[in-house]
């Protein structure tokens, strides 16, 4: 794998709340990561302006708002995300088949022809969760089995891929095929701590397992030199 290919796999989690920080990180890392993730805190604080600033700096955007509501509401919200020109957005697989399918139908209807639409990802089981967490909400399945069940449901609804722990990537590949996108948080380079993620791998391990994109935040943002940290992650991926 080339360095350019490795860079494109990295999604930097822009976990900030100040608009000035958006420009700072976008300008600093636009040549060193493949995409920027805008989550709930940043989007609530700054709104679409955060997305536009990243785009102005030449960056691509994963709008990580994890929609989970009645089908029509999620479909309309996803259309608005698509109209912002983001590359990735997501919804919760636990919202069910109808919610996911109606969303994909709305996107395909509104983005037919030459206009590209964003790829839509379904959230499976959050990487901060384990089997005790699932039991607490009445789910008795083991985490890997639940993840695969949700991934297969998402694929049947027409969703482009899933967000899942790197530990479940190979199982998802077996169940859903090589063309189904898998985006993995819970990735920690060899030089970083695990923080609050419970099901983790190194970048090289996750890519080897078949991950298409790696979501990485604190190991880059908290480093003394964020650019150097991003470059080290690229080195790890290339080295395999």
Curated annotation (Swiss-Prot):
Gene Ontology BP annotations: 'de novo' pyrimidine nucleobase biosynthetic process; 'de novo' UMP biosynthetic process
Enzyme Commission identifier(s): 4.1.1.23
Catalytic machinery residues: 66 (proton donor)
Pathway(s) the chain acts in: Pyrimidine metabolism; UMP biosynthesis via de novo pathway; UMP from orotate: step 2/2
Pfam family, one: OMPdecase
Keywords recorded for this protein, A-Z: Decarboxylase, Lyase, Pyrimidine biosynthesis
Reaction catalysed by this enzyme: orotidine 5'-phosphate + H(+) = UMP + CO2
InterPro entries: Aldolase_TIM, OMPdecase, OMPdecase_AS, OMPdecase_bac, OMPdeCOase_dom, RibuloseP-bd_barrel
The keyword Lyase is assigned to this record: yes
Any GO molecular function: orotidine-5'-phosphate decarboxylase activity
Gene3D superfamilies (alphabetical): Aldolase class I (3.20.20.70)
NCBIfam families named among the record's database cross-references: PRK00230.1 (NF001273), pyrF (TIGR01740)
Function field: Catalyzes the decarboxylation of orotidine 5'-monophosphate (OMP) to uridine 5'-monophosphate (UMP).
Assigned protein family: Belongs to the OMP decarboxylase family. Type 1 subfamily.
Self-association state and partner proteins as the record states: Homodimer.
Protein name: Orotidine 5'-phosphate decarboxylase
């Amino acid at each position: 794998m080339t360095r350019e290919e490795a860079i494109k796999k990295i999604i930097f989690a822009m976990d900030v709340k100040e608009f000035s920080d958006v420009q700072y990180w976008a300008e600093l890392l636009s040549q060193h990561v493949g995409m920027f993730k805008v989550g709930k805190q940043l989007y609530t604080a700054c709104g679409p302006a955060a997305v536009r600033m990243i785009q102005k700096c030449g960056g691509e955007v994963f709008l990580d708002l994890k929609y989970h509501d009645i089908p029509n509401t999620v479909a309309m919200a996803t259309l608005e995300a698509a109209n912002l020109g983001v590359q990735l957005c997501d919804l919760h697989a636990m919202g069910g088949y109808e919610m996911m399918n109606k969303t994909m139908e709305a996107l395909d209807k509104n983005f037919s022809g030459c206009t590209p639409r964003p790829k839509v990802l379904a959230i499976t089981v959050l990487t901060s969760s384990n089997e005790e967490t699932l039991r607490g909400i009445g789910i008795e399945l083991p985490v890997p089995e639940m993840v695969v069940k949700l991934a297969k449901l998402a694929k049947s609804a027409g969703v482009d891929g899933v967000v899942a722990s790197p530990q479940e990537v190979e199982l998802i590949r077996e169940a859903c095929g090589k063309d189904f996108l898998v985006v993995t948080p819970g990735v920690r380079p060899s030089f970083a701590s695990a923080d609050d993620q419970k099901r983790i791998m190194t970048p090289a391990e996750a890519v080897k397992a078949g991950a298409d994109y790696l979501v990485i935040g604190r190991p880059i943002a908290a480093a003394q030199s964020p650019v150097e940290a991003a470059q080290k992650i690229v080195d790890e991926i290339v080295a395999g």
